[in-house]
Structures are given as structure tokens and as C-alpha cells.
């Protein structure tokens, strides 16, 4: 028997830490006209307006493994197909303190996105993101910890080849 998941906010709960048994499968799409713009060519400065089109398919599982110990499995995976216009890529660098954050034109020899932790984060192409976590046995005071690993695979049209990234964390 599966528990019902609250649908109040789409971004509120990432794990129930074994308190619920939840399986959700979702799909969504979004389209909006004239969201991005690009030049027709390097020599033609007139702009082409692009319609943003996004599609996503995801699955979420939060499954108690041993209720007495408080252990649980947490799994989330999503696949996005995004179209922001021809060759659109957006680089982000959260709390990037690198002096060369303005890009490779000013700092040849750095990564495609520039210095520091800048990386292509979204753009026209596909993104697959997966997170797997395991809730460890509860401590005597009732505290729970969930170490997790994530993997992100991105393939943006402008870059041409795909890239992958692993991350580790603790809830």
C-alpha cells in the first residue's frame, strides 16, 4: 500500500526519510513564445526570437526498508528535453569566487565555461539527472542522516558532446 504524497508545493519534499512509502511518476511540458533571442548570423545583427519548449519525465521513490531501524531508500530521476533556441547555453557558477569567471575569451586555457566552478547548466538539448540516497539507522536521539549520490548527464546542441558529473551530499 502506497502513501499519498502532498501536492501543495512542487519543490517542498525531496525525501520523507522513510516516514512514507511513496512512488510518483510525472510528466510535464512548458512552452512560451519569444523567450530568447539570437542574431541571424555573425554579420547580420537582426534578431530571431525563439519559443522556449521544455518537456520532462520523472520518477520519485521513497521507500522504508526497516521501520524499526528507520532506514529507507530514496530515488529520484528526471529526463529533460529543452529547446531555448539555436545553440542556447547558459553557464552558472554558484558562489564562484574565481577571478576568471568572465569566460575563456579573457582567460584562454580555462574550461569551456570559463574559470572557477562555472559550467553549462541549461540549454537547448537534453539533461538526465538521478539521485539515490539511503537513510541510515536513526540515532538514539531520533536524528536521521541520508547520504546521497547524484549523477547529471548533459548534452547541449552548442557543445556537441555530452558531459557527466557526480556529486555527493548528506541530508
Tell me what each language-model feature is.
Residues 2-3, 7-159:
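Detector for outer-membrane/organellar transmembrane beta-barrel domains
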Residues 167:
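Active-site pocket scaffolds in enzymes
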Amino acid at each position: 500500500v502506497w502513501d499519498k504524497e502532498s501536492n501543495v508545493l512542487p519543490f517542498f519534499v525531496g525525501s520523507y526519510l522513510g516516514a512514507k512509502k511513496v512512488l510518483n511518476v510525472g510528466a510535464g511540458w512548458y512552452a512560451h513564445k519569444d523567450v530568447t533571442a539570437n542574431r541571424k548570423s555573425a554579420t547580420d545583427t537582426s534578431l530571431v526570437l525563439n519559443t522556449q519548449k521544455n518537456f520532462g519525465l520523472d520518477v520519485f521513490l521513497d521507500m522504508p526498508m526497516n521501520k524499526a531501524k528507520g532506514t529507507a531508500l530514496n530515488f529520484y530521476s528526471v529526463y529533460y528535453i529543452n529547446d531555448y533556441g539555436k545553440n542556447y547555453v547558459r553557464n552558472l557558477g554558484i558562489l564562484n569566487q574565481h577571478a576568471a569567471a568572465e569566460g575563456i575569451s579573457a582567460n584562454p586555457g580555462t574550461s569551456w565555461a570559463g574559470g572557477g566552478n562555472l559550467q553549462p547548466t541549461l540549454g537547448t538539448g537534453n539533461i538526465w539527472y538521478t539521485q539515490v540516497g539511503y537513510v541510515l539507522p536513526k540515532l538514539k536521539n531520533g536524528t536521521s542522516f541520508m547520504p546521497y549520490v547524484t549523477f547529471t548527464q548533459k548534452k547541449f546542441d552548442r557543445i556537441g558532446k555530452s558531459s557527466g558529473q557526480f556529486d555527493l551530499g548528506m541530508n
